[in-house]
């Protein structure tokens, strides 16, 4: 209930997540009146009740694009969320990120939103000199090298070390590899 959530104020540093993406996805039945789209208001209400220091929000690219009829919000939901979080006292930045550029084996661009309570931005001016997303781009190469990652890896590349370190077992599916994950099973 709301009282329990309010009691968490000052104790929560980060809320990470976002509402279901199905109603916004360009890959599915993108429908503005999908009832799951209204969960964005529950998310905003949750943020307002808990008041975390930081917000990390993720959704599909379609979240940044308006619907044809635009009868509900009149614009892209991403702009609505940014406006609402700014009203609640957050400095907010949103950006589309292709995670394959950062070594993730999937070719899906996602909308990422980062919010920081205004009081923390005001007390730490270095937070406003360079945005979160500028730092990601600037440090991308160093990150990839430090994690031994490549841009646009295949799934096989990404998990191949699992097979090498723990061994393979014969797969029942033709052309598939099966591995032993975690500790090797003892005989």
Regions found by a protein language model. Give the residues of each.
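Short catalytic/ligand-binding loop motif for oxyanion handling, primarily in non-cytosolic enzymes
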Residues: 22-26, 63-66, 103-107, 120-124
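A short acidic, often aromatic-flanked loop/helix-cap motif at beta-alpha or helix-coil junctions
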Residues: 2-4, 100-104
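An acidic- and aromatic-residue-enriched active-site/binding cleft used to recognize and process polar
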Residues: 60, 97, 118
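Conserved S-adenosyl-L-methionine
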Residues: 90-101
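A short, glycine/Asx- and small/polar-enriched loop/turn
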Residues: 8, 105-110
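S-adenosyl-L-methionine-dependent DNA methyltransferase catalytic core
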Residues: 110-187
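Secondary-structure boundary elements
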Residues: 49, 53, 84-91, 116-127
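Core alpha/beta nucleotide-donor-binding catalytic domains of modification enzymes
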Residues: 1-54, 60-79, 86
């Amino acid at each position: 209930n709301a009282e329990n959530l309010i009691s968490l104020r000052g104790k929560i540093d980060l809320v990470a997540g976002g509402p279901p993406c199905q109603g916004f996805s360009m890959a599915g039945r993108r429908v503005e009146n999908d009832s799951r789209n209204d969960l964005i208001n529950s998310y905003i209400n949750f943020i307002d009740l808990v008041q975390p220091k930081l917000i990390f929000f993720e959704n599909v690219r379609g979240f940044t694009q308006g619907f044809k009829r635009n009868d509900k919000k009149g614009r892209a939901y991403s702009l609505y969320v940014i406006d609402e979080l700014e009203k609640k006292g957050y400095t907010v930045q949103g950006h589309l990120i292709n995670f394959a550029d950062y070594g993730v084996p999937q070719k899906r661009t996602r909308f990422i939103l980062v919010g920081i309570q205004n009081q923390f931005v005001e007390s730490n001016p270095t937070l406003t000199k360079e945005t979160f997303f500028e730092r990601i781009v600037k440090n991308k190469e160093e990150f990839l090298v430090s994690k031994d990652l490549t841009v646009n890896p295949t799934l096989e590349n990404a998990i191949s070390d699992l097979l090498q370190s723990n061994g393979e077992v014969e797969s029942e599916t033709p052309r598939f590899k099966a591995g032993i994950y975690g500790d090797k099973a003892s005989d």
